[in-house]
Amino acid sequence: MEHELYFDCTLTEYSWSIKTENKIVNQIREHPPAYLSGGKLDIKEEQQSKCIAIHVGIYWGLGVFIIKDHDVVNVMCDSEEIRDLMTQNRKVDDQIINDKIYFINQLTSHRNLKINYKVIKSESNLATELLSTNDKKSASRNSRGFV
């Protein structure tokens, strides 16, 4: 099966939308305080947050059985910069980003996923609206109802 993963973020929260055929599932989460990760996830830059959103979106999609082994996941990037970061397979001077890329690649390998990174226009990003609405329109902050 083929899925589209949209994601967006701020320094305090991140959202993702998984589109499969005609169904869209929206989720939003706050970044936990850095002390909960022993300081490892002290988010200071948007790129860090975007890498976390991609990782969590794929991981969550697998966990609630939307994404399954051998599926195709089209990760819809709203910048060439993040697409290049995810596809160039090189280390950067940021441990959070390196760790997230490693975990995404590990998930991809273990679950035999085909990941394609595609650049889209920002206004086409389904996950952006989730961050910009005060009532968190149609986005769940937990996984109840999915598992």
Predicted stretch roles:
Residues 1-48:
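RNase H-like nuclease fold core
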Residues 5-6, 64, 116, 145:
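Intrinsic disorder/low-structure terminal segments
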Residues 28-75:
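Acidic helix/loop or adjacent segment enriched in Glu/Asp that either coordinates divalent metal
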Residues 55-133:
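RNase H catalytic domain
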Residues 137-146:
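Positively charged N-terminal leader segments that act as targeting/secretion signals
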Residues 33-34, 101-105, 145-147:
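Short, surface-exposed, polar/charged, turn-prone segments marking secondary-structure boundaries
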